[in-house]
Amino acid sequence: MKNPGISRRGMLKGSGALLAGAAFSTRVMADAPPPEPITPALIEAAKKEGKVSYYTSTDLPVAEKLAKAFEAKYSGIAVRVERTGAGRVFQRIGQEYASNIHAVDVVNSSDAAHFIVWKRDGILAPYVPEDVAKFYPTEHKDVDGQFASWRIWLSIIAYNTSLVKADEAPKSFADLLDPKWKGKIVKAHPGYSGTIMTATYQMQRDLGWAWFEQLAKQNIMQVQSSADPPKKLDLGERAVMADGNEYNIFQMKEAGRPVEPVYASEGSPLIIGPNGIFKGSPNPNAAKLFQSFCFSRDAQQLIIDVGGLRSVHPQTQEKPGRTPFKDIKTMKDDAAAVEKEGDAIKARYTKLFRV
């Protein structure tokens, strides 16, 4: 891979056409291979390898429960979960591959643009799990079979119900500019979080930078991770969050905490977290088995129930009490544009918010 120290834009210079819109419509290789079912031969080969390494930006408790479910289903294969933020996952793999270290088998990132880089660099392995071929929408799978949407979620507005009455809560991003919210808003940073970078791109595209200029005058609390605004909200340090993980709000609310999600009338930013296998996988059969498991109905139901995430697998059931995904207006994801404009967005945001 390229030097992981150079900019996101530099790493993808000239490759913006690799991804069109929200769809994973990369066209730089052959067509996707035929879908592969889980067979006794694959299971036997995977058990001979005995392990699989999963690099992920998924919340650690969710990743660990996924790993335990796989180990329970396929005894004798240990899953090593390496969990960190999406940017650090990307950097680590870049550093390892630059040193000819092939330690990762399967990867997940909350920054879909990472998969553009890995695919362009020719280090992802084409592999299509049977469930992906049968059930996943076209726009949620790479046409060359190198990755697919393992999880989706939203970056949303939310509020602390102990500090804000429901009829006074913001209903839109425009509402956050009301002077009554000055000093009461928390927001994450696109320079740190892949989720917030994606959300910031969609918001500046749909709302314009003028909205951010007005928000910057609201004396917001600036935090780093997309998981931080829900935490500040829960603690009562701020009354409203302008962005952050929907799934954290679900988890907190269902645990009895005083938080409530809001789906902005302008649309909520859509975040996509794909999974892929590396060509240099040291455990290729275990990698295929784990990848197939991740996209199965059972695993997808697990990330919904345990992780508060969304799934495009049509056989899953949404958890009662959560607003159905089909009823939510969302903004359009565009990973290629995020990669192309990411550095400029970070620079402009940092200058605007002075942090």
For the regions a language model picked out, list residue spans one by one.
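Short, polar/charged alpha-helical segment
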Residues: 36-47, 51-75, 157
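Periplasmic-binding protein-like
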Residues: 152-153, 181-191, 213-216, 222-223, 255-281, 294-317
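Extracytoplasmic ligand-binding site segments that recognize negatively charged/polar headgroups
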Residues: 56-67, 79-97, 102-230, 234-237
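N-terminal secretory signal peptides
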Residues: 1-24
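A bilobed periplasmic-binding-protein/Venus flytrap-type ligand-binding module shared by bacterial periplasmic
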Residues: 158-163, 201, 271-283, 294, ...
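Extracellular/periplasmic bilobal clamshell ligand-binding domains
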Residues: 319-355
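A ligand-binding cleft/hinge motif common to bilobed small-molecule-binding domains
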Residues: 113-117, 239-258
